[in-house]
């Protein structure tokens, strides 16, 4: 099999998923084009050599419908010969897009692939696709599908994670993210300009510098009402060892909704067609799993554990981890179960503070991981995401 090299990893800032957000004036095609143009303008990418664009996108509705990987490639002026594939594996989508690109190059089918994700939650709201698993109780029950927040509260209840622990995790995420932003550590960000060439967004917008434990403690649980409408009773039936479901998740310790796009340029060569741009990292292993769908967000723990086992490695062998903060309890559980040291885990904050643009999140996290690996001069790292229904993906990368 061919070795697969990451030549470049770039992303837009994460904008607030509101009409007032810094990215909301651009449509998804325009936002992706900012990143495509960056590769071309730097002469990293020679378009005639590009084989395929593969993107993750969760809410494939409206402006994000119609195979946005292919349509955005055409919009950007890529050759007609460039294939396009859009996938939805919930919040693991962009890492799974990357995995598909990795496999196509490793197998010899392709030489150059752009893989990543897009989600414009300000313009295409979460759940606006009206999928039956979210809107029809019978379908959800038959498929054993729960909303993400309900799953997070279940994980907290099963693992005896307190509200205070969740709030402390959220506060730490905010503090680390703010420090990283003020220290200009997010080097992978490509500033976004509008059609009039005015700067609209150059940094992640979701960080809340004013966050305190006192403020977090005053927020009301977000999913208690949903629980009282029958979800709690169903979860207690499935997990009889529990006496109650503890609703510890609030807007303060849950991931912030965001707009963003991210792309990773993959190659079978150690450099792009322009030899100036050499491989930043290689992909050394991938694990794709699905856990019990009733647990909803346990996939990143299982995927990380599987990846380590398959690569014959332990947590001690990994220099740094970027793990999806899919609600506070999920990341607390990952850290506890896998015994990841604090100084190796999400060292520059996570999506609770920085924002969670669903279909783009995994490769946004990967770009930040590579930035940090280069900054502190370490050799390897793992990025992992959870998705709904127990989905999980983890990827091991190694610097050249």
Predicted regions and their residues:
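Conserved beta-ketoacyl condensing-enzyme motif
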Residues: 23-92, 97-112, 118-134, 192-203, ...
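Active-site-proximal alpha-helical scaffold in enzymes
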Residues: 87-118, 156-186, 263-270, 336, ...
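Conserved catalytic cysteine-centered active-site region
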Residues: 26, 59-110, 143-150, 217-256, ...
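Glycine-rich loop/linker segments at domain edges
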Residues: 12, 16-19, 102-159, 228
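Short, well-ordered amphipathic alpha-helical segments that serve as non-catalytic structural scaffolds
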Residues: 28-44, 68-72, 97, 148-155, ...
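N-terminal extracellular/periplasmic Venus flytrap/periplasmic-binding protein-like
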Residues: 10-13, 24-25, 30-34, 168-269, ...
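N-terminal amphipathic/basic leader segments beginning at the initiator methionine
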Residues: 1-17
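Glycine- and Gly-Pro-enriched alpha-helical subdomains that act as flexible
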Residues: 269-317, 335
């Amino acid at each position: 099999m061919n070795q697969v090299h990451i030549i470049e990893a770039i992303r837009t800032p994460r904008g607030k998923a509101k009409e007032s957000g810094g990215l909301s004036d651009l449509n998804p095609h325009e936002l992706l084009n900012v990143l495509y143009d960056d590769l071309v303008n730097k002469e990293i990418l020679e378009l005639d050599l590009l084989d395929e664009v593969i993107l993750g996108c969760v809410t494939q509705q409206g402006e994000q419908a119609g195979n946005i990987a292919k349509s955005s490639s055409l919009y950007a002026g890529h050759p007609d010969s460039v294939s396009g594939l859009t996938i939805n594996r919930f919040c693991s989508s962009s890492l799974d897009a990357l995995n598909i690109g990795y496999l196509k190059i490793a197998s010899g089918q392709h030489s150059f692939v752009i893989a990543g994700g897009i989600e414009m939650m300000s313009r295409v709201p979460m759940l606006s696709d009206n999928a039956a698993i979210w809107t029809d109780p019978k379908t959800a029950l038959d498929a054993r599908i729960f909303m993400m927040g309900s799953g997070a509260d279940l994980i907290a209840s099963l693992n005896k994670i307190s509200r205070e622990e969740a709030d402390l995790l959220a506060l730490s995420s905010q503090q680390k993210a703010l420090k990283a932003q003020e220290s200009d550590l997010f080097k992978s960000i490509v500033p976004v300009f509008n059609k009039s060439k005015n700067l609209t967004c150059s940094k992640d917008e979701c960080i809340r510098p004013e966050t305190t434990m006192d403020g977090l403690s005053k927020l009301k649980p977000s999913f208690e009402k949903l629980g009282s409408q029958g979800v709690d009773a169903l979860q207690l039936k499935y997990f009889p060892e529990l006496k109650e479901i503890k609703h510890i998740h609030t807007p303060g310790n849950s991931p912030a909704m965001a707009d963003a796009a991210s792309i990773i340029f993959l190659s079978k060569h150690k450099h792009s067609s322009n030899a100036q741009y050499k491989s930043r990292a290689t992909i050394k292993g991938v694990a794709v799993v699905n856990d019990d769908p009733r647990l909803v967000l346990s996939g990143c723990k299982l995927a990380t554990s599987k990846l380590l086992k398959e690569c014959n490695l332990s947590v001690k062998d990994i220099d740094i981890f970027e793990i999806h903060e899919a609600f506070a309890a999920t990341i607390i559980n990952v850290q506890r179960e896998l015994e990841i040291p604090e100084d190796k885990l999400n060292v520059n904050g996570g999506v609770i503070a920085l924002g969670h643009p669903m279909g783009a999140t995994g490769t946004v996290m990967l770009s930040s991981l590579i930035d940090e690996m280069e900054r502190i001069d370490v050799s390897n790292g793992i990025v992992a995401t959870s998705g709904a229904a127990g989905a999980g993906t983890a990827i091991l990368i190694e610097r050249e």
